[in-house]
């Protein structure tokens, strides 16, 4: 009885691990690596959700200010625009508690799919402008970016 149970568990684990490995290999083939930039605030006032490509320090300074603070991790992310560019996804101002975060960036034939997580919460007594900035290898700068709301 114990041998049958052990054999069934081993067979199940083998089956699950072989399926998982295949999905990982196929699924990761078009993933584009990125780093999320931190400690910035948006200067403009967007009236609708928008994706912006930022290809220079000058463009970054026009769109975002540095929001440094004392302590570990307080410096704004440095971006080397000779090697990288930034993708900013910006929402209009809102008085709702909002979580906006990138989930993945995937290369499709002639475009990049930017998948993000958006959660809207309770009304607050103040307004914020949700956004995120990701830093991507410059070899992808000419691709169109398509947004896809996703789930974590």
Descriptions of predicted regions:
Residues 1-26:
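Bacterial Sec-dependent N-terminal signal peptides
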Residues 19-152:
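Exposed, flexible binding/inhibitory loops of compact, secreted disulfide-stabilized domains
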């Amino acid at each position: 009885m114990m041998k049958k149970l052990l054999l069934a568990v081993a067979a199940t684990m083998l089956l699950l691990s072989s399926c998982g490995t295949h999905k990982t290999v196929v699924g990761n083939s078009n993933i584009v690596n990125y780093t999320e930039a931190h400690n910035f605030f948006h200067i403009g006032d967007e009236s609708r959700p928008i994706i912006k490509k930022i290809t220079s320090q000058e463009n970054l300074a026009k769109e975002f200010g540095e929001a440094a603070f004392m302590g570990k991790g307080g410096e704004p992310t440095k971006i080397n625009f000779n090697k990288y560019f930034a993708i900013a996804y910006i929402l209009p101002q809102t008085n709702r508690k909002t979580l906006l975060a990138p989930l993945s960036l995937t290369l499709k034939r002639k475009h990049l799919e930017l998948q993000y997580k958006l959660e809207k919460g309770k009304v607050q007594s103040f307004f914020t402008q949700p956004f995120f900035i990701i830093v991507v290898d410059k070899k992808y700068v000419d691709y169109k970016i398509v947004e896809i709301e996703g789930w974590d």
